[in-house]
Curated annotation (Swiss-Prot):
This is Rhomboid-like protease 4. Residues 102-124 have a biased composition (Polar residues). It comes from Toxoplasma gondii. Belongs to the peptidase S54 family. The chain crosses the membrane at residues 219-239, 352-372, 382-402, 404-424, 445-465, 567-587. GO terms for molecular function: serine-type endopeptidase activity. PANTHER family: RHOMBOID-LIKE PROTEIN (PTHR22936:SF69), RHOMBOID-RELATED (PTHR22936). Residues 131-142 have a biased composition (Basic and acidic residues). Keywords: Hydrolase, Membrane, Protease, Serine protease, Transmembrane, Transmembrane helix.
Length: 641
């Protein structure tokens, strides 16, 4: 077992003083509070002077000196001369022991520490905690002299000079600032009342104007996309009402084709009102509705249009008529290929097919953007939403060209997929990782339930893949997952914590704290090298680096590992887009393969593509075009001569 710290003192009478049993007396004791920052426990006896004179290192004891004996708590006891000053052996959890003999704080702490009853303070040099001799240690060949850095300053003194709030260590603002996490109903005050407990209130940041809080006021993408999606859906409903379910937008009146005189059969422009539409639709013009079952119709009157009933369309209780989706830019592969309407890849991701559709997408989208956007920023989140939606629509257009698709589900699943690189990037500071796991389960359930209904699974899978690739292509660091405490944090998050005993949770918490302390110390050692920059040029470079660091983001190592991950994921995303665009727009490619269609629990849905060869009045303007049909009857009618 490795102790947090140990100050070793010896008694000439042979009784060892306790080290590390009560309050630690060294300057590197670690205590992680609610703010997850490293705190120093300094003894009350230490002089408050900022820079007291240094104490010379103790002489090396002779080889024939007395051997070290363990104390009651495992600390080692040395006996030696009263004229020497004891160096301090410091042990950080999860790391090998480091000798700090020249640090002023540690020396004064060891010199001024009061001995326990029945013992006297010893000034003999202490040996390492593992009992090995300092003089012959292969790791410390010359332990009599302190370990120094390139500037000649002892390493332990340099470590203590760097505060835990130094921007080189982290750039979070002062106070308890936690990362946003999915809403956990098990942590709500209402659920706490049901269980007969009080909800623990976390201390808030003393920043009433929220100037320094990196997790507030950065929801531009969340607010703007939500408002845009709602506005476009309102426009769909208005257009469905004013266009008579998408059947009439022209003011031209077409008289009955059975009239005797040719002049009476001539069309006329009705300049005011809906006279032209009312005449063309006859009794089928009413009732008018923006959505619901009343928005369905039987097509056009058969007394004016012989095959008018072929254009009938039914609607559900929360949806507008499907005709308006095609008019307003829904995703339909046939129009992209034959009429060069590639804009449908973009416009369809902002349209929705019903109230339930948009409410589900917005509820999930707002929750994830509330988590991701404050850390990823405006540009990175905007590109995530856009690239994810296009990625989903590309896969849908190529794999299922026989149906029309609308909705921001591709972008929403891109946000869900982006939670994976987000967790890798910020794992150490995510408040409730268990809820993130629940979100991942929602993705799987959503895809599986989509196989039973009229949902576009290709848009969901393509969006999730695009979100994962873009997240890793733009990731700042992957070092947060080094020695990540996944099991420990999951075990202490409800509802998983209900199944773990309190004693086990405490052990897991201590293990996580040990890893945290080691990580902070390692980053401090790296910060020593960064602080060497001096002069005007060095200060300017330091200022630029600080401006490039976004608040709330962990230190970006910019190492070879990060660049490899970014490059591979960016190349994969580019190849994904390139292949799908070629199969969507290149006739030599999309005419040579058969699309699979949607996969459901009942099997693959019918989808067949080919060139229209049937000559009839109904095929005017379509003869010779390459078209995809979702109906076997229509495919046989138009694709066979």
């Amino acid at each position: 077992m490795v102790w947090t710290s140990a100050v070793v003192m010896a008694s000439p009478h042979g009784s060892a003083s306790r080290a590390g049993s009560n309050r630690r007396t060294d300057g590197l004791s670690v205590n992680l509070g609610q703010d997850n920052t490293l705190k120093h426990d300094t003894p009350t006896e230490t002089a408050p002077s900022a820079s007291p004179p240094r104490v010379a290192p103790a002489p090396i004891p002779p080889k024939g000196g007395p051997a070290a004996t363990p104390g009651k708590d495992g600390a080692l006891d040395n006996r030696g001369s009263h004229d020497s000053v004891p160096p301090v052996a410091v042990a950080i959890p999860g790391r090998e022991e480091v000798n700090a003999t020249a640090s002023q704080k540690s020396v004064v702490a060891g010199a001024n520490s009061q001995p326990t009853p029945g013992t006297q303070s010893s000034k003999a040099p202490a040996s390492d905690v593992d009992g090995s001799s300092k003089h012959g240690s292969p790791e410390h060949p010359d332990a009599g002299s302190p370990e120094v850095n390139a500037e000649g300053v002892p390493v332990e003194e340099a470590l203590q000079a760097i505060g835990d709030d130094d921007p080189l260590i982290h750039n979070l603002p002062d106070g308890v600032v936690g990362r946003r996490a999915p809403a956990n109903p098990f942590n709500s005050s209402m659920y706490a009342k049901l269980r007969g407990k009080k909800k623990k209130h976390r201390p808030k940041v003393r920043d009433p104007k929220l100037n320094n809080n990196p997790l507030r006021g950065r929801l531009v993408v969340c607010i703007s996309t939500t408002a845009l999606l709602c506005w476009i859906y309102m426009w769909e409903l208005i257009y469905n009402f004013t266009s008579f379910n998408g059947r009439c937008v022209s003011p031209v009146m077409y008289p009955d084709y059975k009239l005797q005189e040719a002049k009476q059969r001539q069309p006329y422009v009705i300049r005011y009102g809906y006279g032209g539409c009312e005449y063309n639709l006859g009794s089928l013009a009413y009732p008018r509705a923006s959505f619901g079952t009343s928005a369905g119709d039987k097509g056009w009157p058969v007394d004016l249009v012989p095959n008018g009933s072929a254009g009938s369309a039914a609607t559900s209780w929360d949806s507008p008529n499907a005709r308006v989706l095609r008019h307003l830019g829904g995703l339909e592969t046939n129009y992209i290929r034959e009429y060069s309407e590639t804009f449908r890849l973009f416009t369809s991701m902002y349209m929705h097919g019903g109230w339930l559709h948009i409410l589900i997408n917005l509820s999930c989208q707002i929750q994830i953007l509330w988590i991701i956007e404050p850390d990823w920023g405006f540009l990175r989140t905007t590109l995530l939403f856009f690239l994810g939606g296009i990625s989903g629509n590309l896969l849908s257009a190529v794999a299922d060209p026989c149906s029309i698709t609308v909705g921001s589900s591709g972008s929403m699943y891109a946000l869900l997929g982006a939670l994976i690189p987000y967790c890798v990037e910020y794992w150490k500071s995510i408040p409730r990782p268990g809820c993130i796991l629940v979100f991942m389960i929602v993705v799987i359930i959503g895809i599986l339930t989509g196989m039973a209904g009229f949902t576009d699974n290709y848009a969901h899978m393509g969006g999730a893949l695009g979100g994962i690739l873009w997240g890793f292509a733009s990731i700042t660091t992957v070092s947060a997952c080094d020695k990540c405490t996944l099991g420990e944090r999951m075990a202490m998050t409800p509802p998983f914590s209900w199944c773990v005993p309190k004693a086990t949770q405490q052990k897991l918490l201590e293990r996580a704290k040990a890893r945290k302390a080691e990580a902070i110390r390692r980053r401090k050692l790296q910060a020593i090298q960064k602080k060497k920059a001096g002069g005007a040029r060095g200060k300017a470079m330091y200022a630029v680096k600080m401006r490039l660091q976004e608040e709330g983001r962990p230190p970006c190592k910019m190492s070879f590992r990060e660049w490899v991950i970014r490059g591979l994921c960016a190349a994969a995303l580019f190849a994904y887009w390139l292949i799908l665009f070629l199969y969507l727009l290149d006739p030599s490619l999309y005419k040579s393969y058969s699309p699979p269609g949607q996969l459901k629990f009942s099997g693959w849905l019918y989808c067949k593509c080919g060139t229209i060869v049937y000559q009839a009045p109904q095929t005017y303007g379509n003869l010779g075009r390459f078209w995809c049909f979702g109906s076997e009857k229509d495919a046989q009618y138009y694709l066979e001569p």
